[in-house]
Amino acid sequence: MERSREELDTRLKQQIQFIVEVDKVKNIFRQTYLADANRKENDAEHSWHLALMAVLLKDYMKEEIDLAKVMIMVLIHDLVEIDAGDTYAYDESGAATKREREEKAADRIFGLLPEDQGQEFRKLWEEFEAYKTPEAKYAHLLDNFQPLLLNDASGGKSWEEHGVHRSQVYKRNERIPETSEIIWEQMKEIIQNVEVICTQCPERYVYAASLSRKTDRPQNKLEALLVSVG
């Protein structure tokens, strides 16, 4: 349907308002550190990383994937955190109120767009949350695999800070084999690349050696600690 100039002007204003508003996602910092462990990543960086991974890894999926749909899904999936804030993957108390906070945020943020685009984004966000379609499963795989890779590269820094246990990571990723056995095998290799060094916390993560490093010199506090007790 052809739109009038007035309708186009209104539509563009709404789109610009949304574009400027979602710039705030750059100030929402996650608990995962960048690969160099210098600082934590923000939601914009995380979403960009997932979109790139979506292009690169689709051949490892068990089902055919609508790539364009997945890319939009991962680019918008965390926009609700502008209002709701980031809920750490292993924060049980935060998880209890997460859905309520994010539903309210979705109403406001996607409501800034022209109605048709707002409904499209809201539908994709709900599809991601439902975790049922091949695209939603792929998006979740990416959302789980990316922080695992960054924790591997950074020596498990965020896991060490939060006292995350091996069992928690396995539990969080228990549905990944539904989507890709190959990616799951790689994830298990990362998860299993840990050593127990504390009798007080037998499952606590401490990296023996990062899969991404090829040097005998301790690269970070965790590796240095392991060497000192080994």
Could you say what each language-model-derived stretch is?
Residues 1-230:
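Alpha-helical, largely C-terminal catalytic domains
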